[in-house]
A protein has these predicted regions:
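Conserved HGGG/HGGXW glycine-rich cap/lid loop of the alpha/beta-hydrolase fold
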Residues: 22, 27-72
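Flexible "cap/lid" loop of the alpha/beta hydrolase fold
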Residues: 114-119, 123-161
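Gly/Ala-rich beta-loop-alpha elbow adjacent to hydrolase catalytic centers
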Residues: 105-113
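Short beta-strand/loop motif that positions the catalytic acidic residue
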Residues: 212, 218-220, 224
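Catalytic histidine-centered segment of alpha/beta-hydrolase-like enzymes
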Residues: 250-259, 263
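Active-site loop/oxyanion-hole signature of alpha/beta-hydrolase fold enzymes
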Residues: 19-22, 27, 64-104, 264
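Alpha/beta-hydrolase fold catalytic core
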Residues: 1-36, 57-60, 98-99, 125, ...
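Conserved alpha/beta-hydrolase catalytic His-Asp/Glu region
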Residues: 137-140, 158-213
Length: 274
């Protein structure tokens, strides 16, 4: 983890709390009357939100957690879904006195905010999503066939594993199967976190968007292939008070690639809360 700097130029405050059965690492920095929560994407950690924090640290108190299973935080005590992650972040906000706050979330972080914004609207004053995950991509015919083939082979190998003397060979076959059919994110995880990953990405959060009460700004790269622009447009339709800004040429990490523009837009949206 990097060294975070607070408004005095000294060492930032890096802390941990035991929440929901695991250690949650988070950083507090910045100054000002406003409170700003920054949430990273899957497979990353809070360091990837630092460029955003730097742009707001002179006007906001900023909270940047590492999600359980990421960065310096411990793993979930059992496979978690979006709801468990949302509960964890809600408790962190309450225990650190960060209610209400503004929030800027990227990718997986948007899943967490979506659940919280719909079920605990008092938590957020304003919301910014960038490359937000939460809407399931429809499977193409080819992808559907590939998924079905994977499930059949997996079931077959699991059956082999129950036969005496075949367990080791079956495990090796399953491992090769995962590497062939699993995504890069999936294959990078250990067995415990794979179960969490599957639970998280299998949930479609469309039903939550109409229940948002906070004003929401969606900032999207038009070249995003992970969470394509049509997802941002769909969220704009479903969230009652939402607007969409498109960053031309921006990928899933447009907020980093076009940091100056992203931060300018975000600052304009949040300036009344500083």
């Amino acid at each position: 983890m990097p060294v975070y700097l607070d408004d005095s130029g000294g060492a930032g405050r890096m802390m941990t709390k035991n929440i929901c059965g695991t250690e949650v690492s988070y950083t507090l920095q910045g100054s000002g009357k406003g409170k700003l929560l920054l949430l990273h994407g899957w497979g990353c950690d809070g360091r990837l939100m630092q460029s955003v924090a730097n742009a707001f640290a002179d006007r906001f108190q900023i909270l940047i957690p590492d999600f359980p299973g990421h960065g310096n935080s411990g793993k979930p005590p059992e496979p978690w879904g979006v709801q468990e992650y949302a509960d964890c972040i809600r408790i962190l906000l309450e225990e650190t006195g960060f209610v209400p706050c503004c929030v800027i979330a990227h990718s997986f972080g948007c899943r967490i905010v979506s659940v919280l914004a719909a079920t605990y609207p008092q938590l957020f004053v304003k919301i910014i999503f960038t490359g937000g995950a939460g809407i399931r991509k429809p499977l193409s015919d080819e992808a559907q066939k590939r998924t079905e083939h994977y499930k059949k082979l997996k079931g077959l190998y699991e059956s082999f594993g129950k036969i005496p003397l075949m367990h080791s060979a079956a495990e090796k076959m399953e491992d090769r199967l995962r590497k062939k059919y699993g995504s890069a994110d999936y294959n990078a995880l250990d067995e415990e976190m794979r179960k969490t990953f599957v639970k998280v990405i299998s949930q479609d959060l469309t039903e939550y968007y109409p229940h948002f009460q906070a004003s929401t700004l969606l900032i999207w790269g038009d070249a995003d292939t992970e969470t394509p622009l049509w997802m941002g447009k769909k969220m704009e339709e479903l969230i009652p008070d939402a607007g969409l800004v498109i960053l031309e040429g921006g990928s899933h990490f447009a907020y980093l690639e076009q940091a100056a523009r992203f931060n300018l837009i975000a600052n304009h949206f949040l300036k009344e809360e500083a």
